[in-house]
């Protein structure tokens, strides 16, 4: 990810990581100060390839509602929360058409306060919303209306 881009915590697997879940938890600790003891990992989402050709394996976990996040200044500018209900109401600011290899996707861009949630982060978010809440957001077709 580049400076000023919004992203979930994550990074490359290190030699000392026993598996990708360990990587996800380590990166979450390093980037936002949420240690493994504060996360109940509930599963993974589909692997997705970033626009830079990096294979990403998203992990989903439950965290305490009022956890005091501590952003790592060298990596993270801010941490913010958005109510799930807001996404389920589909408050997209726009839809981005993304073509990558043989894929053509219609990805929502959500604007929460001054933050744009788009691209890979939005693709991961939409899969999570569809899996956990049956949101019915289809990114393979243009949005209705």
Stretches with model-predicted labels:
Residues 47-55, 68-74, 117:
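Acidic pyrophosphate-coordinating catalytic loop
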Residues 14, 64-67, 85-87:
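Short, charged/polar surface micro-motifs in flexible loops or helix N-caps
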Residues 8-43, 83:
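The catalytic Nudix box helix
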Residues 103-131:
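GST superfamily/GST-like fold recognition
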Residues 7, 81, 119:
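Short aromatic/basic micro-patch
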């Amino acid at each position: 990810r580049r400076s000023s881009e919004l992203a979930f915590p994550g990074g490359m697997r290190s030699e000392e990581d026993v598996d990708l879940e360990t990587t996800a938890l380590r990166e979450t600790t390093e980037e936002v100060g949420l240690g493994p003891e504060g996360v109940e990992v509930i599963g993974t989402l589909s692997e997705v390839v970033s626009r830079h050709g990096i294979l990403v394996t998203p992990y989903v976990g439950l965290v305490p509602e009022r956890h005091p996040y501590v952003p790592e200044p060298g990596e993270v500018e801010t941490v913010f929360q958005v109510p799930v209900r807001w996404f389920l109401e589909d408050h997209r600011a726009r839809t981005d058409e993304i073509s990558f290899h043989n894929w053509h996707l219609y990805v929502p861009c959500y604007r929460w306060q001054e933050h744009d949630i788009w691209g890979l982060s939005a693709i991961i978010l939409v899969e999570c919303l569809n899996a956990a809440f049956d949101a019915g957001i289809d990114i393979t077709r243009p949005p209705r209306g």
